[in-house]
């Protein structure tokens, strides 16, 4: 949560003006450039989200198969048939290099990337509601999330900060997905 959460301030004009400036003049980032950056951030974000969900579902199903032999390509094909917007050509073997789920310590855990985005966006939405530099909200995040680390179950920490369980709404909004 913290690493993705902190990225949110890099998309806020007030935060960018506070932490950055032109290397020679000190002038802030021009507003029109920030607007173009914000527009580009959401470009095909729904496609990227579906792709991440495809990877997560593939990972779950692959690691839920019992027995010594798994038809990896068959599992991937069935996932793609169900969720892919654009199915790669049959010669594509991306799974052979998908190290996250085989050698990266994320076996049956690839979904955690998307879950971290849900938590990050929802936690940040509290700052959007209260003001991105709100001292009390910052202290609450510090004491309920950062200082606690892994000392309590993550959901308990999130609820202590946000006052409720996570919702996906903020991630969809931050991704430019309306619906």
Regions found by a protein language model. Name each.
Residues 1-179:
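Cation-handling catalytic/transport regions enriched in His/Asp/Glu
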């Amino acid at each position: 949560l913290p690493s993705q959460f902190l990225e949110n301030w890099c998309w806020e004009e007030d935060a960018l003006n506070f932490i950055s400036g032109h290397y020679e003049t000190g002038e802030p980032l021009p507003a029109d450039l920030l607007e173009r950056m914000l527009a580009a951030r959401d470009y095909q974000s729904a496609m990227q989200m579906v792709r991440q969900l495809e990877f997560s579902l593939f990972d779950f199903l692959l690691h839920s198969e019992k027995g010594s032999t798994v038809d990896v390509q068959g599992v991937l094909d069935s996932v793609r048939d169900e969720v892919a917007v654009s199915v790669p050509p049959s010669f594509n073997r991306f799974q052979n290099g998908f190290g996250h789920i085989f050698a990266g310590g994320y076996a049956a855990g690839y979904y955690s990337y998307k879950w971290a985005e849900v938590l990050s966006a929802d936690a940040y939405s509290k700052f959007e509601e209260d003001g991105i530099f709100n001292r009390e909200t910052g202290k609450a995040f510090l004491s309920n999330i950062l200082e606690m680390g892994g000392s309590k179950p993550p959901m308990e920490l999130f609820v202590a900060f946000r006052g409720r369980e996570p919702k996906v709404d903020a991630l969809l909004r931050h991704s430019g997905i309306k619906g």
